[in-house]
């Protein structure tokens, strides 16, 4: 609409004028740039700066609420023009032109004359306020650096391996390179990577630490670690970023309407935020989700944007992976940078990043998604958007096949054209006064944007297909087979990067998926052994029962007997992991029917609070044995917060390999084409990671004791024996439920 207004403004109206000036305060030089919507050369020789604003609100109301900062923007442009004229132009008109979206004749003009002296005072006040912010940040940096001069490790003693991890982290930062760390759960990895990186703030190797994790429990642990360092005297600012939809304080149905016309927390945001941040930073150093919500509610501002603005002023920022790696929602400063940034990157639970990155760089659009939005759009104003959606639905309906999947070499051009038409009509709808549209449209708009942002024509690491149901096309899919180049490219933009996890085995597999090289496996890898005594654990492998899908019903009684013989020998808490929800239910019903144990099962789609309540059931030394029935690879497979010494044992039923299917077979073919073992890359290794993560729930502290039982005939195969050698070289093989009982009885008797 801006262009339409500019084009209709006459020949003396010069649109989109770039402006620039330099301001030297003596110790700071600012290069100030902007682009005026328009400059008008009036008949009398005077100039007018025009700033165009559009809205769907009542123009008078919109003007009254926003004129101060709208006019302020135009006044800065006017000041630059007069300043650059070197005194030849003494005054200028400043105009703010308000237009109703989609109605060029419905307008409100606010115009005022200003002299250079008036504008110069205005600009100087703003500039000096901005410089004060810069200096405040500089003062904080000086205070921070001074405070870490004598910063001690925040705990009385180092655990085994911690000093090695600190030294390795320090080396990676000093070399400005990438490192990979495999260190067991319970060693205290978080403090060992943060401590040396924080100590290096003073050396100028980093100006900000990005700490990435996909788990809320690990986010809390990182905040707790920073808090411990602050209590040791470090003047650090830290903020944890929560997903926009999670932290949004609007009611359901309005969470995606992020504009000042509809959201009370977006209204007047930028006129409030500076004072809010100054006040917040004067009161505390560390901000979690609850802190941010409290500040946002008190000041009626957007909590998500507040967290991002606090991050600008923070030394340590804790994010989900998508904030750095997602091509759609990633931080623009990182995503758009071609140069190394003065930041460092810490990636926790790094074994999860490759699969998450594949999700970020893949997309799927379903016919049903478009159909649902079509039915929810109402009113005459939505007619053109609905028509665009009908065209897309028709595109699906015209494609027919007796196959389930049609392989493509690229996304069809006609489909891309239809998607762009959908985007255009959606934008037109949003500009209309009082336009109403459901959250489902906002979600679909985001999905289409993400789809079009991906490579649309054949790339070696991409696969394209259309799926069919009952002979009709029902979805189109862009599938990223390998995201390692994107992980490598983005992590290259940081001054130094450390990937760390309790599970990076097999090492060659994970380092390659994280964008590393063969050389990295030798020179940039730290593999720390477990600091916990092996005598405190019993690791058994029952490799007799077949857990292949076709054999599961037959082997179920044998599997359940082995589990029973293990859990009956010591009163306590046990987690039992199964290959599917259906299989888990069968096991749960059998054990529940015995009446001997307290049986608690994982439910489908549990909320965060329901998960916490589930875990709270497992207290140390319960009166009756508690059995937790869980799905292998599910929400309780890793990154959970259990009470100390909560578990006495874990049983893992199956090797955890994903179901044989088209997507995984494509991965298999892709890696086979690169000369690697395709089956291992697509099936064995992802499944084995689930197994090891689940097994790691037991021994988490020096004085923990427990039993681990793996059940699946495939654990007896040579490839799994080799994988288990890297993690559990002390395991024993058992051939019957009776042997499980005897070994378990002996273990607990020796440790009673």
Q: Over which residues does each language-model region extend?
A:
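Conserved RecA-like P-loop NTPase helicase motor core
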Residues: 532, 543-554, 604-716
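Conserved pre-motif I regulatory segment
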Residues: 140-182
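Mg2+/Mn2+-dependent nuclease catalytic core
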Residues: 21-123
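Walker A/P-loop
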Residues: 174-196
């Amino acid at each position: 609409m801006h262009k339409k207004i500019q084009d209709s403004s006459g020949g003396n109206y010069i649109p989109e004028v770039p402006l620039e000036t330099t301001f030297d305060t003596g110790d700071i030089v600012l290069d100030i740039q902007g682009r005026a919507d328009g400059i008008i050369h009036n008949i009398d020789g005077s100039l007018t700066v025009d700033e165009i604003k559009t809205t769907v609100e009542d123009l008078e109301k919109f003007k009254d609420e926003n004129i101060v900062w709208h006019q302020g923007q135009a006044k800065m442009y006017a000041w630059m023009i007069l300043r650059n004229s070197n005194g030849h132009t003494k005054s200028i008109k400043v105009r703010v032109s308000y237009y109703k979206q989609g109605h060029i004749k419905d307008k409100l003009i606010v115009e005022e004359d200003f002299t250079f002296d008036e504008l110069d005072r205005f600009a100087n006040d703003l500039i000096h306020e901005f410089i004060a912010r810069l200096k405040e940040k500089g003062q904080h940096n000086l205070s921070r650096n001074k405070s870490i001069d004598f910063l001690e490790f925040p705990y009385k003693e180092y655990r085994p391996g911690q000093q090695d991890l600190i030294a390795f982290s320090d080396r990676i930062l000093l070399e400005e390179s990438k490192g990979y760390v495999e260190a067991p759960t319970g060693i205290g990895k978080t403090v060992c990577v943060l401590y040396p990186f924080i100590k290096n703030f003073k050396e100028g190797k980093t100006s900000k630490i990005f700490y990435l994790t996909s788990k809320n429990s690990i986010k809390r642990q990182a905040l707790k670690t920073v808090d411990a360092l602050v209590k040791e005297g470090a003047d650090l600012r830290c903020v944890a970023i929560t997903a926009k939809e999670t932290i949004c304080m609007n009611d359901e149905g309005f969470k995606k309407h992020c504009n000042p016309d509809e959201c009370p927390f977006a209204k007047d945001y930028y006129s409030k935020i500076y004072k809010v941040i100054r006040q917040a930073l004067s009161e505390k150093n560390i901000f979690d989700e609850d802190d941010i919500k409290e500040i946002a509610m008190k000041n009626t501002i957007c909590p998500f944007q507040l967290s991002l603005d606090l991050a600008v002023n923070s030394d340590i920022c804790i994010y989900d992976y998508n904030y750095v790696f997602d091509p759609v929602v990633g931080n623009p400063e990182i995503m758009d940078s071609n140069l190394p940034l003065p930041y460092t990157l810490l990636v926790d639970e790094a074994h999860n990043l490759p699969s998450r990155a594949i999700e970020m760089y893949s997309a799927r659009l379903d016919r049903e998604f478009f159909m649902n939005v079509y039915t929810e759009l109402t009113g005459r104003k939505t007619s053109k958007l609905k028509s665009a959606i009908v065209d897309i639905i028709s595109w699906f309906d015209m494609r027919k096949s007796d196959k389930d999947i049609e392989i493509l070499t690229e996304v069809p051009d006609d489909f891309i054209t239809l998607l762009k038409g959908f985007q255009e009509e959606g934008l037109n709808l949003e500009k209309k006064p009082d336009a109403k549209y459901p959250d489902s449209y906002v979600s679909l708009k985001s999905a289409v944007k993400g789809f079009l942002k991906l490579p649309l024509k054949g790339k070696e690491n991409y696969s394209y297909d259309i799926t069919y149901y009952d002979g009709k096309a029902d979805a189109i899919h862009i599938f990223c087979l390998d995201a390692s180049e994107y992980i490598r490219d983005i992590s290259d933009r940081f001054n130094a990067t450390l990937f760390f996890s309790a599970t990076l085995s097999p090492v060659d597999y994970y380092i390659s998926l994280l964008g590393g090289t063969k050389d990295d496996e030798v020179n940039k890898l730290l593999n720390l052994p477990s600091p916990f005594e092996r005598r405190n654990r019993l690791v058994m492998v029952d490799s007799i029962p077949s857990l292949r899908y076709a054999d599961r019903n037959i082997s179920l009684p044998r599997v359940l007997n082995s589990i029973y013989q293990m859990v009956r020998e010591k009163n306590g808490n046990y987690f039992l992991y199964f290959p599917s929800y259906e299989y888990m239910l069968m096991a749960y019903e059998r054990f529940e029917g015995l009446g001997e144990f307290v049986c608690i099962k994982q439910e489908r789609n549990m909320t965060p609070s329901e998960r916490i309540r589930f875990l709270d059931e497992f207290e140390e030394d319960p009166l009756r044995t508690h059995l937790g029935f869980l799905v292998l690879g599910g929400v309780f497979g890793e990154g959970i917060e259990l009470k100390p010494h909560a578990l006495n044992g874990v049983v893992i039923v199956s090797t955890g390999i994903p179901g044989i299917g088209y997507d995984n077979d494509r991965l298999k073919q892709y890696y086979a084409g690169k000369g690697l073992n395709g089956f291992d890359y697509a099936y064995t290794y992802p499944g084995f990671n689930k197994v090891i993560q689940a097994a790691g729930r037991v021994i988490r502290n020096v004085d923990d004791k427990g039993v681990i039982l793996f059940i699946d005939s495939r654990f007896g195969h040579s490839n799994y024996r080799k994988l288990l050698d890297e993690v559990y070289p002390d395991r024993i093989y058992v051939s019957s439920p009776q042997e499980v009982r005897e070994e378990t009885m002996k273990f607990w008797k020796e440790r009673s």
